[in-house]
UniProtKB/Swiss-Prot annotation:
Keyword set, alphabetical order: RNA-binding, Transcription, Transcription antitermination, Transcription regulation
Keyword Zinc in record: no
Full protein name: Transcription antitermination protein NusB
Family: Belongs to the NusB family.
Length: 205
């Protein structure tokens, strides 16, 4: 895992808790928000483990049903296929849990925490300007109508490009990767398209 990717994920989970106005936040307030984000991730991992356990049990039950209840080869095959799909989903959820100890270790590094706070601060202090850039770059959409997670992904990327001197392509790629994890199925494509329009806009002097 890359430390800055961890910082971006923590920032994404944190900025949803910030007030929408640009009132000054004390550093200790930002720290509290970030701690809440870590706790949110802990809860997600616990839920993933519980869900994976349930899916494995359902998969096992379907295999047993295929042996005892299937009336023909076709129905047996369908039950086994469902069991395989459930097992794959469970394995993917377990993958998240396996990565979590490394995530927490990195999240406790000062450099990760510092960059998380830089990101949160940039979005909070420049919220109005960032939102104006995004409104101009959206086609047939309004920012307030987007899913909160998508709007915040876009805000983070713009903050990195405009205020934190992160190369445009890096900011876009990282936002797309987070969208694959947190956004809807096609969300990452939408995020990519909007941010490419943003880069053209902010390149104009």
């Amino acid at each position: 895992m890359q430390p800055r990717r961890i910082a971006r994920e923590l920032a994404l989970l944190s900025i949803g808790q910030l007030p929408s106005n640009s009132d000054r936040l004390a550093n200790q307030d930002l720290q509290a928000v970030m701690i809440t984000a870590v706790r949110t991730l802990v809860a997600e991992v616990q839920e993933a483990l519980e869900t994976a356990s349930a899916e494995l049990k359902r998969g096992s039950d379907r295999i047993l049903d295929s042996e005892l209840k299937a009336i023909d080869v076709q129905s047996s095959r369908a039950m086994v296929t469902e069991a395989i799909d459930l097992t794959k989903t469970a394995v993917n959820r377990l993958g998240l849990a396996i990565d979590f100890p490394e995530f927490i270790q990195l999240a406790n590094q000062q450099s990760v925490r510092d960059y998380t706070l830089d990101l949160i601060g940039a979005v909070h202090h420049h919220r109005d300007e960032i939102d104006q850039i995004l409104e101009t770059s959206l086609v047939d959409w309004q920012l307030h109508r987007l899913a909160h997670i998508d709007a915040n992904l876009l805000r983070l990327a713009v903050a990195e490009m405009k205020y934190l001197d992160i190369p445009n392509q890096v900011a876009i790629n990282e936002s797309v990767e987070l969208a694959k994890k947190y956004s809807a199925e096609e969300g990452h494509r939408f995020i990519n398209g909007v941010l490419r329009r943003v880069t053209r806009q902010i390149a104009v002097p």
